[in-house]
Amino acid sequence: QLGLQDPPHMVADLSKKQGPWVEEEEAAYGWMDF
């Protein structure tokens, strides 16, 4: 899960991901876990 240390572009990217693909994206971002 992404934390508060994420760059602004990531935060903005997550804010527009409000569909069924969000879980899939979270899994893809799992390796970048802070």
From Swiss-Prot:
Keyword Secreted assigned to the entry: answer is yes
Report the superkingdom from the record: Eukaryota
According to its UniProt entry, one GO biological process term is: G protein-coupled receptor signaling pathway
Q: Where does this polypeptide localize? A: Secreted
Residues bearing Sulfotyrosine? 29
Which residues, renumbered to this chain, carry the PTM Phenylalanine amide? Answer: 34
Q: What is its main location?
A: secreted
GO molecular function terms listed in the Swiss-Prot or TrEMBL record: hormone activity
* PTM sites of type Pyrrolidone carboxylic acid: 1, 18
Looking up InterPro entries in the UniProt record yields: GAST, Gastrin/cholecystokinin_CS
Spans through the membrane: none
Q: Which keywords does UniProt give here?
A: Amidation, Cleavage on pair of basic residues, Hormone, Pyrrolidone carboxylic acid, Secreted, Sulfation
Q: What does UniProt give as GO cellular component?
A: extracellular space
Function as written in the Swiss-Prot or TrEMBL entry: Gastrin stimulates the stomach mucosa to produce and secrete hydrochloric acid and the pancreas to secrete its digestive enzymes. It also stimulates smooth muscle contraction and increases blood circulation and water secretion in the stomach and intestine.
Family indicated by similarity: Belongs to the gastrin/cholecystokinin family.
Name the UniProt record assigns to this protein = Gastrin
Q: Which organism is it from?
A: Capra hircus (Goat)
